Each structure stands twice: as C-alpha cells, then as structure tokens.
C-alpha cells in the first residue's frame, strides 16, 4: 500500500464502510484492514490492483467488497475462505476465469462480472447484471457453474490420482518383475556355476581314476612280465629236478628188481641144483618153478624164442 497517499485508514471508515477507492493502490493493506473487523464493507474500486494475495482471504469479516475498475487478472484460490461475503463487484476488470474455490462462497447473493474477458461458458453462466435481480441471478448461476467445475475438477483429480496409482502399481509390478527376473537370472547363474563346478569335479575325479587305472595297468604289466620271466626260468629247472628224481627212482627200482631177481634166482638155483631141494621150504618153491616153466613154455612168444635159439645153434 502507498502509505504516502493513505495516511490514516481509520479516517476512511464511515460506519461499517471502509472506502479505499481512487487511492491508486497496487496492493491491499491486509494487515491494517484486519485491525478493523467492524468495517464489513470494503470499497477498493478504481485502483490499480492486478492480483489479490492469499492473505486477503483471511479478512473473513467482510460482507461486501467492491473491486470494480481495477486491473485484476485472477483471484486467489483461497477466496472461498470469505465465508461471510454476500456482495462482490468485479465489474470492468481483466478476469478470464474464476478459481475453483469460488464455489465455496456459500453466502454470496450478488455478483457483477460485466466487462471482463470471461471464457465463453463462464460468460454464459454469468449473463447480464443490469439490475438487482440480474446480479442476484448472476451470483446463483456462477456459483452453480463453479460447483459443477469443482465436481469435474474433483473427478479429474480422482481420475488423475487413480491413474497415478495405476501407474505406480504398474511401476511396482514392473519393478517386481525386474527383481524377479534378476533373481531368476542370479539363481540360474548360481545353478550354472554349480553345474560347472560339478563337471570340473567329475572331470578331476575321472582324471584321477584314469591315472589310477593307468598306474594299475602298468603295475599289472610289470607283474605279468615278471611272471613270464619266472615261467621261462622255471621250466628249465623243474624238468631237471623232475629228471633227477625220476632217474634216482628208476635206478633204485631197477636195483631192487635186480636184487629180487638175483635173490629169487639164487633161491631157485639152490632148491633145484643142491641137495636142499628135498627140504620142506624148497618143495613148494620147486613146484611153483616147474609150473611157471611149463606155463612159459606154453606161451607162443616163448616157443618162438626157443625155436629161434635152436635155429641159431644148428
């Protein structure tokens, strides 16, 4: 507020009216006005106001406000806080739209929006304000229009919030899918790593087994070679040992047979040629000897031998 032009607000009060019109104001002295709550009619017409601050809406004691012939291009969203406002003159400003909060002015009974570049739907709802009746109708229609806009805004806000929630859900779902894919990839990687280690372990075990098998084969070859060498040496010694044993056995046997033959021949000779042939022990022997001789003479082979011997003598 230009304090040089308005020295004392109190001097501008007449009853319940505070007249600050034609004061060349570019902003409203909200703090000073709040000190006079009994001044329920505020005249700010014919000034250079472009906007109203949100703090202006704290002057809830105001019932009537005249803002005609200013340069207002917008009203604060908080204007709905002026719950006691019944009369609002906005004639000849530069307003195109009204804030959604305007629908909260439930006490508003009179409104003038003439000579403002209003957007078509708002201008149609406002209509003319050439007399008291039309201005009252303007207030009613504009409030109704703003309530519809508020409902649409709330629905749009709800749709936007719903869309944002859906987008957030999709984002969360994508994040979960991404995490699941990463988890699955990590799990697969671990499984592949485990399989690789298992194959390496099996390869190591197989290599060790192959080495053991080769070592075993080499040992078996060495053992077989040693056995073959032993077998080659053994046949040479074993037959010699066998031959020596057999020779010794046959030699002893032959000697025994010769001794037996000599013994038997001696006994037979004694019993046949000496006077002992009449002895008791020689009689059976002589009988057996004679039987043996007769049996031998009966053999063809013996006869052939005797014949050959006779032929040789002649």
UniProtKB/Swiss-Prot annotation:
Its main location: membrane. PROSITE patterns: LRR (PS51450). Keywords: Coiled coil, Endoplasmic reticulum, Leucine-rich repeat, Membrane, Microsome, Nucleus, Repeat, Signal-anchor, Transmembrane, Transmembrane helix. The keyword Protein transport does not apply. Residues 165-197, 212-237 are annotated as: Disordered. Residues 269-314 are lumenal. One of its GO terms (cellular component) is cytoplasm. Residues 1-247 are cytoplasmic. It comes from the Eukaryota. The keyword Transmembrane applies. GO terms for biological process: intracellular signal transduction. The chain crosses the membrane at residues 248-268. Residues 215-225 have a biased composition (Basic residues). LRR repeats lie at residues 14-35, 38-60, 61-82, 84-106, 107-126. Interacts with SGO1. Required for nuclear import of FGF1. This is Leucine-rich repeat-containing protein 59.
């Amino acid at each position: 507020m230009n304090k040089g032009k308005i020295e004392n607000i109190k001097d501008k009060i007449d009853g319940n009216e505070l007249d600050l019109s034609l004061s060349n104001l570019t902003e409203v002295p909200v703090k000073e006005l709040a000190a006079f709550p009994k001044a329920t009619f505020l005249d700010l017409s014919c000034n250079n106001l472009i906007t109203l601050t949100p703090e202006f809406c704290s002057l809830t004691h105001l019932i009537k406000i005249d803002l005609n012939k200013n340069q207002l291009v917008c009203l604060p969203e908080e204007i709905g806080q002026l719950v006691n406002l019944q009369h609002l003159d906005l004639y000849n400003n530069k307003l195109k739209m009204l804030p959604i909060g305007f629908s909260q002015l439930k006490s508003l009974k009179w409104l003038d929006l003439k000579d403002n570049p209003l957007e078509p739907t708002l201008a149609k709802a406002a209509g003319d304000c050439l007399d008291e009746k039309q201005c009252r109708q303007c207030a009613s229609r504009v409030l109704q229009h703003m309530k519809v806009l508020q409902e649409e805004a709330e629905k749009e806000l709800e749709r936007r919030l719903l869309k944002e929630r859906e987008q957030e859900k999709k984002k969360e779902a994508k994040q979960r899918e991404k995490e699941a894919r990463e988890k699955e990839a990590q799990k697969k990687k671990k499984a592949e790593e485990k399989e690789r280690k298992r194959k390496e372990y099996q390869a190591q075990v197989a290599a060790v087994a192959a080495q053991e098998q080769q070592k075993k084969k080499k040992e078996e070859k060495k053992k077989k070679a040693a056995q073959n060498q032993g077998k080659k040496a053994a046949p040479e010694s074993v037959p010699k040992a066998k031959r020596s044993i057999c020779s010794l056995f046959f030699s002893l046997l032959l000697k025994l047979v010769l001794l037996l033959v000599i013994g038997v021949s001696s006994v037979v000779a004694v019993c046949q040629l000496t006077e002992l042939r009449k002895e008791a022990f020689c009689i059976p022997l002589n009988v057996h000897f004679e039987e043996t001789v007769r049996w031998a003479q009966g053999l063809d082979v013996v006869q052939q031998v005797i014949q050959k011997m006779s032929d040789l003598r002649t």
